[in-house]
Amino acid sequence: MINSAKGRLVAFDNKKNLELIGLIFEADGGDKENIIIHVHGNYGNFYNNKFIWKMSEKYLNCGISFLTFNLSAHDGLCEGYRKGILDYVGGAVSDYSESILDIEAAVDFVKKAGYEKVTLQGHSLGCDKILEYVLNHNDIEKVILLSPVDSYAVQERWLGIHKNETVEEQLNRLRKLCKSENGILQWLDLNEYGAEGLNDDWIYKIPVTTKALLSILQGSAFKFIKLKNGVDFLVDKETYVFLGKNDGLRMCSLEDMVNFVNKHFTQCYVNDRMACDHDIIGAEDALINDIILWYKK
């Protein structure tokens, strides 16, 4: 059994009036100086990854508050509410760009609660989303990237195996298909999107609708953390990057990924020492202890 710290459920709305729900864990003593906001990955949520549970305890023990919340793109397909009116949300149907509004809403929520120094922490596709936010906002103190991957390369490999198609060809085809749908919620076949990882633990199909996949392919996940011909960028915030040695979704060598992040993050600390997978299973305590050492330095 894994225990978490004692938190309280919170809710806040993004600019599209979608209610976002999460858990906040506040450090004792009334200190509202430091907080880490966790942004989950593709089809994830605020509680599923067990390292989140351990962070809630370990961060609090060090005087760091912690917020973990559901993006509009959480899970696959879920019921959400916009000003009390039902709307279907989730990774399979939501527009990728709304996740950036979700992050903005979370930052505004903790700022209004009195927190002064906000750190954004992303896992997997959450790394791409917080990166886009940081590149367009100047209200973040530090950045934590857990298992960032080249999503373009992952989809490129998937399409080569399952569709005999390039990402650009898929994009053009989906754009035409999207124009013909006229607002219909159109589910694609299961060979359109997925991961053909470099080990058996990371091979899976991802159900998705046309508009949602098109928004992902055209979003920041396919632009910035892209080792071949990606959009150039530079982040000058203090940044912690975790790269597990056995990450089956990393489509390049560990050395190439380390070089990439060192090039694009000017104040970067890279932890590439741990022999664990994309979800950091079995190395949670060691990772969190290392993050805290970096954070407190």
Language-model region placement:
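Active-site nucleophile loop of the alpha/beta-hydrolase fold
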Residues: 144-154
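Active-site signature of alpha/beta-hydrolase-fold catalytic machinery across serine-
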Residues: 132-136
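Gly/Ala-rich beta-loop-alpha elbow adjacent to hydrolase catalytic centers
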Residues: 121-126, 130
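Short, surface-exposed "cap/lid" segments of acyl-processing enzymes
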Residues: 28-76, 80-84
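Serine-hydrolase catalytic core
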Residues: 12, 176-296
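N-terminal cap/lid segment of alpha/beta-hydrolase-fold proteins
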Residues: 1-30
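Alpha/beta-hydrolase active-site loop
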Residues: 88-112
